[in-house]
């Protein structure tokens, strides 16, 4: 039926597919419907609800509404920390997205703080040489640059480059 949890899962996947195709308006619409179903069936603080909140927050960010992105990601982070803990990889993904939202809103100090936490989780769970760690290093380096610490930015981006070249090659 229209409100069945499996329908919610399909709506989530379809929303993410639209996001991959660059249609963030459709992504947002499908994820909003999915969120309504998940909140109704699982509750407002269920891990599945948290995952959809993360995706929906990022959809809002892709649409340029960083305030809504931050709000959805903040809710998602609370759920993930409660259910998975403060150092779980899924928590780290949301921390990274929330850090980038804060950066888009111009609060580079908060961006740095959230990305630093995300980096600690990435290094612990994936290792210091993993591409996920490299992506977080890139974002964190840019945050430091926005704060005016170009030496720190250079160091972090150099580490990210080494990881990327190791995993993807120099070409």
Regions found by a protein language model. Give the residues of each.
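Helix N-cap/loop-to-helix boundary motif
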Residues: 1-8, 42-50, 84-92, 126-134, ...
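"A position-specific structural signal for the A-helix of alpha-solenoid helical repeats
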Residues: 12-13, 48, 54-55, 90, ...
């Amino acid at each position: 039926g229209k409100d069945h949890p499996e329908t919610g899962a399909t709506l989530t996947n379809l929303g993410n597919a639209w996001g991959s195709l660059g249609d963030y308006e459709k992504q947002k619409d499908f994820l909003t419907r999915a969120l309504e179903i998940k909140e109704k069936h699982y509750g407002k603080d269920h891990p599945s609800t948290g995952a959809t909140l993360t995706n929906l927050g990022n959809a809002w960010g892709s649409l340029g509404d960083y305030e809504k992105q931050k709000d959805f990601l903040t809710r998602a982070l609370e759920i993930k920390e409660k259910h998975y803990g403060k150092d779980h990889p899924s928590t780290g993904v949301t921390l990274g997205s929330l850090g980038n939202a804060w950066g888009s809103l111009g609060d580079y100090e908060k961006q740095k703080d959230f990305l630093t936490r995300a980096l600690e989780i990435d290094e612990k769970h994936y290792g210091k040489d993993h591409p996920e760690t490299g992506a977080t290093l890139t974002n964190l380096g840019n945050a430091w640059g926005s704060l005016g610490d170009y030496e720190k930015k250079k160091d972090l981006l150099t580490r990210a480059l080494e990881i990327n070249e190791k995993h993807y090659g120099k070409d």
